[in-house]
Amino acid sequence: MLGTLFFDKQDRELLRMINETIDHGPSQDLEHKVFDANLHPHGILELTTTHEYRMAHAVINLLGNLEAGGAPDRLMALRILRDEVLHSARTPFRYNTGRVLIQIMKEIIRSRQDELTQLKLVHDFRKVTSGNPRLVRQFLNTYHLLEMPEEWNQLTVDHHVHDANTKGRKNATHLIMDAWIKGIRYITVVYYNYVEPAAARELLQAAEIMGVDVRIGLEFRTPFRDRFVCFVWAPRGFSDPEAFLSFLAERPMVALMNEGRKASLWMQRHVMDTLQLWNAKHAPALAEELEIPVPLLEPEAFLAYVGTGQTSFLHLAEYAHKTLLKHLVQRVKALQEEALTATSERQSQIAQLIRRMDMLTTEVIMETWLKPERNPELPSPDVPDNAPDTPELLRMPPHVLLDWLSCLRSGYRITLQLAELTAEDVLELLWDCQGMITHLELFNLKEWQEGHLRHLTAINDLQIAINKGSVLHLKQILRGMIRTLEASSSEKDKERCAKFRIILRNIPSLQAPYKVAPLRIRIGTDSTSHSGVRHGMGLAMPETLPHGARRQIARGKQFRPIYLPVSLSLEFRETYAEQERYSFFMRWLGPRLRRIWGFGHFGLRCTKEWRAISGITQIGEEGNVITMGGIGGELNNGLRAERTEKTRPRWLGFSRLSTPISNTLKVLAGFIPALVTFLYTQEWWVLAWFGAPLWFLITGLRNIPQAILGGGGMWSRSLLRWNDYVSWTRVCDSLLYTGLSVPLLEYFIRVLLLEDGLGLTVKDHQFLVFSIIAGANSIYISLHNIYRGFPKEAIIGNLFRSLLAIPVSVFYNDVLALFLPFFTTADPLLILEPGAAIISKTASDTVAAIIEGLADWRNNRRLRYWDYETKLQRLFDCYAKLELAFPDQDILSLLSRPEEFTRLTSTEARSLQVESIINALDLMYFWLYQPCAQQTLTSILRTMTREERVIVARSQGILSRVREVSQLFVDGLLGRNFARALSFYLDSYENYILTLNKRCAGFSNGHRPLLRRRRHISDCL
């Protein structure tokens, strides 16, 4: 029953392909099919596979390639994934749709063992691809994600996170993908002591792909008053990832990284000593307490578990928990069986023992046995040691270390971490380091939750006093510190008191470095994606989010953030700039219109931006910064959870019904109320029995020309047929809502309100009756347009369509009144009066076909602009690479001779040849198969220079090399199912090249024709 009623055939086929890939891994052919970044999601790839499967394949590869050697594959998967999700939505709701799609795909992969859950998720996935804002917002709430502005200008940050190369769980690509899903725009990934070039390359390239602003920070510990203080050094001023990697390869940086590796190895020795102590002391004691065998930890296996990360106590706690968990499960199962026949006293003991085992989580192991303070017999890595084996980096005073770092790069940010520091500590460090500290990590979510930031208010007051340049305020703070130190009997406090008196006499020297560049702040979560008791990464400023997200935060139902005690000062900026490319008409019209009042910004591109003024920050009870991540899991091992057999439900809800059944029910749900209403309200048998079918016929016929108009099919010469433009699901939706409108318009409005309530009839008040019915219809349609996620142009147009429908209704009424006497002897008014709603409906749908068709046309044009923007940029990038690869060749001339071009690139630039062919194939597919593509490209070509049009036209000539292009298909460029794509290419390339050449040649720069019509196109291009 479930197999026929619920889910579509496409759902099951997609799930089968996804699970095959999860179980067996991608084959070489599949890798070719998915992982060529130059193939556009809306290009020729559509002829071979669905974008849903390509997304799934990309996510599987991204999450599955955890080994270091898989970084190139992960990056390629990320690039493909981003292109797929950003080009999937059919509405302007692109970014939020993409975030939901990736999240659903991750859930599909995680639910591998539950086929029903997977089918539900696949069905949801295919629905969300429409980009309906209502559906997207619903799933954002489901997955505890905040809606982000489509301008992607939100202020969301996290300046302290870790990836798998330190103590985090996620590799760099996975981390960036999850940051993008959450909507984080600015992120700093912190590495301890050193960073491997391979890790930096993956992180920077992944961030570049996803458009995330990422910085790499190196955390160093330095001794300060019998403890370590931490600094995060983030060099800056790099134009691209390669510039940063070149900086890492410089000799001074290599020396620093070598010293950093020594410091990390020193920490690793402490962790390994703790591992040995666990084996010798803690494991036997725990085994005796829990009455289970606690396995000893193998050092080699533990280091293999850490992998590319830097060994830490957190890794050790997780590894100990992992090795222990299976024994806990077995022991709990045995105890539960024993409890069935045990005495009540023994049952109480068993329950207590099971509770103890259930609470033995990673966090408990860490806090109870592995923290340095829990093992006083071992030297603590948190206490400075001047022993000979202590690395030099861990013995340097703060000012010496910072002086070394500042000499390596002129542009840098050095952030002081404030865990367990007082305002006196911060002041002394600022004085010692003489302005080299540029930022304070004023808020760290992990340290705050652990109670290590007890002096934030005093530190914040000190920062404000320094940044304001207020000598009086700073002097008051200093004098208060001196009074406190004077009251202490400690020798160290007396020594510090003398130092503070020196600072008091030299306040201008303390302020001087921060007059030009104020002492700024950083906020972060210190997220590792490991612990279930900590909030995940991401901090947001609600003022920068859309209204829906702010309402979601205020409700606090599915998304319950923490308001942090940090208030940032924000500024909002709008920048208007001229478009990069204008048509000749816009170049002439724009400046003239902008002189008129109210049109000052006509034709200008508006950029909206939020910015935090980090030098002005207040610490208080509740600020304007919230957490974006939730707590990862429960604080137990799940051993006490009752395991019940999952029964397959008989009913999965209307949203899970298969598309044919769902569409049938929609039509019936609309038709039955319409039929009943006409039978009840109409006396003439024709309208009583045929009014509802006529009503539906009007709507159905209206949707077809509307879809063709929206797809641009009336003017293009594409390969699309008329039914390719029509979405039958959308037609069924229209029939549902139009059927429900019959009781509204015919019964409640015309009969109850107008006739019975106000005494208004078509016979006596023709214009007024039609106006009221049309107005009610417009409001009703606009409301369900919003619900269905229609373009805003259609929604706004439908609000005003009653004004246009009124004269059309009167016209139709007069025409029918004129012609009805030829078909019947009855009074025409006796027929027209009960048919007023039908006439109004016909007029309204006539106007709607034009309004919604034009709205769909504008939406399709917007989608094609996105497609062409991406593909033409790649085409020109490829051309630039060719010019650089062959500096002695005239590439523009060579493109006009495809045979010579392929001969040259086959031997010296094979990858660029393949890229050129892919670009040409995608552009040909756009032209012949995508709605509104031909009109859109024509508009774009009109804004290009002559040279750019020549490049576009000549680059398509490579399609004439049938042997080379066909060989790519055979070699697996598009996977195994390439027959349809190859047939399309062979049938279409000649006419396409000729047509595009003519189109490119048919423009003029200024008033002169680009090419004379008598000259042969191929000679000119």
Regions found by a protein language model. Name each.
Residues 243-359:
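Non-catalytic, alpha-helical, charged scaffold/linker segments
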Residues 1-186, 195-256, 262, 335, ...:
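Charged catalytic cores and adjacent phosphate/nucleic-acid-binding surfaces used
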